Amino acid sequence: MTTTPKSEQDRVIIFDTTLRDGEQCPGATMTFEEKLNVARMLDDMGVDVIEAGYPFASDGDFEAVHEIAKRSKNSVICGLSRASHKDIDRCAEAIKPAERGRIHTFLSTSPVHMKYKLQMEAAQVYEMVISSVTRARNHTDDVEWSAEDATRTEFDFLCRCIEAAIKAGATTINLPDTVGYAVPEEYREMFRKVRETVPNSDKARFSVHCHNDLGMAVANSMAGVAGGARQIECTINGIGERAGNAALEELVMAMRVRQDKLPYWNNIETTMLTHASKTVSAATSFPVQYNKAIVGRNAFAHESGIHQDGMIKNAQTYEIMTPETVGVKGTSLVMGKHSGRAGLIHKLEELGYKLSRNQIEDVFVRFKALADRKKDVYDEDIEALVDEQLLHGQDQIKLNSLTVIAGTHGPQRATMKLDVDGQIRIEEAEGNGPVDAVFNCIKALVPHDAKLELYQVHAVTEGTDAQAEVSVRLSHEGRSMTARAADPDTLVASAKAYLGALNKIVAKRQRDVREAVPAVAAAG
């Protein structure tokens, strides 16, 4: 297959504003070190321009931009500034250490913004555009000017301001859909008409900046590129003001996957996209929605039996890109109530089981029954089903009864009765809290060296009568076993979950012994 040479005129500059517009998202504030870490990651993955912050906003923002400017190896480091000279001068000082720095200054141009926000006449705004860009150009050759709320600005006035900004020295013109109001066709046409109308439009690169208020930020961004823009302003995970910004990972992969319709290219290393998503999610404490395009937990996960069957036969049946291209190790066939026999058989083979047709049928029937009761069915659950079928028995350790004494004074005490292989054992133990006392009881009754890795509790439903669902994960000999249990009594649910994980460890150990016997015999 012949590869078409990349043309510079089809190159799209990726301008990441996660550290500025993204951090303006309520609750997404990052620490100084977190900003440096995110900036380093953006620099490494090939982002062309990093908008590192708004230096005039605070001393902390200034210091972050200044330090990022010092450390950047590849990216242009940009600072945001209002149209005032004080803002611009402060921004210039912040980006000074950068090998390549940019000042991004902006001013509102729409009637509603000029009247209510700026309380200025159009003539005053026009003069301020010239004044601010001129001031910025005195500090650096790389100046970006944004017409805030461009999509609601009168066209003739927008063109006048753009022409003046370019004449004053702006090298990039950004026309943002500030409130996410535009639709793709009109956004594309705006860029086409502006570039056609403004006489010196060829002297600057045009840029898109789209918000997601109507869910069209990515579509609008690509429409703007189709209209002649060659810079996209975006954020990791699409975080930003209100409903967010266009998501960098979606834009980059859209250009990569649909080269037939989007014949543009960029410098992003796509295998870092998932890592970037997780880094920003951790820094902002904003979880990524499971069904988020490209980087969501379910982006390459399949539960439907029909889909799993297709994926097993050929991944192209239900995936338009490979998970490896975005830094995911592989496709996940999620086992649940929608899974069919083909999916279960594939999972059993992955786990190393070789079962007869009758055994598979037995496991499948019990798997479907379990999937109807459980939201998530994990590998450990399937292993437990198989172990139960192969061992012709149920859990060897069962909870018979539990009594816990807890209060504000004195140690917490638990008394537990277990059925261990048909033998009743009773023990009492104390702990630093009732849950600790319960787990200490189990350790006394069934001595083991498994380590507790996870203990989580949440209410299954609302109200004071809600069942508590407890998850416990135990680590033993390099393998983790997870179990869940639900009960109106949180302590009973905790005991059941712990015992469930312990039973899986016992079953796994017995299975390992069975597998070792044929190997020894063969060696003999």
Swiss-Prot record:
Catalytic activity: 3-methyl-2-oxobutanoate + acetyl-CoA + H2O = (2S)-2-isopropylmalate + CoA + H(+)
InterPro entries attached to this UniProt entry: 2-IPM_HCS-like (IPR050073), 2-isopropylmalate_synth_dimer (IPR013709), AIPM/Hcit_synth_CS (IPR002034), Aldolase_TIM (IPR013785), LeuA/HCS_post-cat (IPR054691), LeuA_allosteric_dom_sf (IPR036230), LeuA_bact_synth (IPR005671), PYR_CT (IPR000891)
Top-level taxon of the source organism: Bacteria
Keywords: Amino-acid biosynthesis, Branched-chain amino acid biosynthesis, Cytoplasm, Leucine biosynthesis, Manganese, Metal-binding, Transferase
Localisation per UniProt entry: Cytoplasm
GO aspect biological process, one term: L-leucine biosynthetic process
Entry EC no(s): 2.3.3.13
GO molecular function (one): acetyl-CoA C-acetyltransferase activity
Region annotated Regulatory domain, chain positions: 398-524
Keyword Aminoacyl-tRNA synthetase: no
Pathway(s) per entry: Amino-acid biosynthesis; L-leucine biosynthesis; L-leucine from 3-methyl-2-oxobutanoate: step 1/4
Chain sites annotated for binding Mn(2+): 21, 209, 211, 245
GO cellular component: cytosol
Main location: cytoplasm
Family: Belongs to the alpha-IPM synthase/homocitrate synthase family. LeuA type 1 subfamily.
Protein role: Catalyzes the condensation of the acetyl group of acetyl-CoA with 3-methyl-2-oxobutanoate (2-ketoisovalerate) to form 3-carboxy-3-hydroxy-4-methylpentanoate (2-isopropylmalate).
Subunit-level organization: Homodimer.
Protein name per the record: 2-isopropylmalate synthase
Species in which this protein is naturally found: Rhodopseudomonas palustris (strain HaA2)
